[in-house]
């Protein structure tokens, strides 16, 4: 069993856009909302390969239930320590030509 610790987890959103126009209005389709953060990403990779893992993470109170549901769906054992504040989020824009902007 490998235990991972994530002190700064994130809610990672990936949005597909045809092309990115700086200073303009960009519309896209939400492709995915995934749990992230270094330790969470390691636990996700380990679980995908069938290894036993246990994720320990500190989440803002509002994100803790969401993380719990997502990690349960991925069959990742976990302990979530609730903290004040909100959980960090990241947005990735993926253009049709393969360019990625974070």
Report residues per predicted region.
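Glycine-rich phosphate/adenosyl-contacting loop at the front of the ribokinase-like
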Residues: 1-56, 65
